[in-house]
Amino acid sequence: MREGLTDILVPGLHSVHGPGKIQGTVFFNEQMAFNRDVSVMLLRSLDKGVTVADAMAATGSRSVRIAKEVPGTEVTANDISADAVAYIDANIELNSLDNCVSSNRNMHSLFAEHSFDYVDLDPFGSPVPFTQSAIRGCRRGGVLAITATDTAPLAGAHAVKCRRRYQAEPIRGYMCHEGGLRILMSSIARELAKFDRGMKPLLSFYADHYFRTYLRVEEGAEAADRTLGRLGYLQYDKDTLERSIAYDKDPVHPYGPLWLGPLHDKDFLAGMKPDDLADEKRVTKYLNLWRNEIDTEVFVYDMSELSSHMKLSPPKIDAFMEFLNQHGRAAKSHVSPSSFKTDITLDELLPLYKEFSPDSC
């Protein structure tokens, strides 16, 4: 099959939609083409001459796309499975690449011996067992790119598993996907701090069935302390829609710890270009959402939740954003088509929602 500018040999039996299932000996999920598109786009915005490690490369689809579509990269496509490495080697040969090499190692041993400018960790399920090794393998000032597909724990459907795996209390309901993303980022921040390292998010998002974050690693105890200082907790009352955050845990703020800093580096996003990708239309749509969303406001509102609370029909979200921007700042969020963020307080927002509802016209 062809993805972006790259030809990829994949198993005949593979996942096409949704959270993939392991079928056969080597995993491949067509729906993750968007994830791979974003990796290519982001890497093109980094400095040239980047060394890349794809820690769990499977077929090597991400690795060979990066090697072929991002100039100046040197890529190591690693997988512990010999069957996977056979696919990687075939894909390197298929695309005539001299800047991509295969590696058949346990990723923990690979990163104990080698370090890279960009480390990609995209496991089947949770990244938690592998995060420390990925951090070891990331050079000073490098970038960690980490995926989590265990959305049920992170989004609160399996809260006990989230507590055990991420040492965090998840939130259910319409905030669940932003909450899950911020729990993942909090978990990585705490692991980085063990190495006297901090992080600056370049891009973080929820899409399809997974969470994904790209983090610039910052060195030193001050960076670690600064990062830990951006972790905190959420209070939310579903009856009143009131929410607040706190940087120290207390009985009033049960959800977290969460990353409370920005999800993206807006200056970095401004330089990203969605050209020559597998699904340019979708990447462009998300890139515009990421660039415009108000990620300094920590949690989203949802049109359906406001409608239910107010017992009013919801207005069209685009028109409502225009209306709200006459009173403050507001923009749609990427986490769902009906979600948005605003710096307008809840006490101000509810009367404005009532005023703009079709039922009030």
Please tell me what each predicted stretch does.
Residues 1-361:
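SAM-dependent transferase fold signal centered on methyltransferase-like domains
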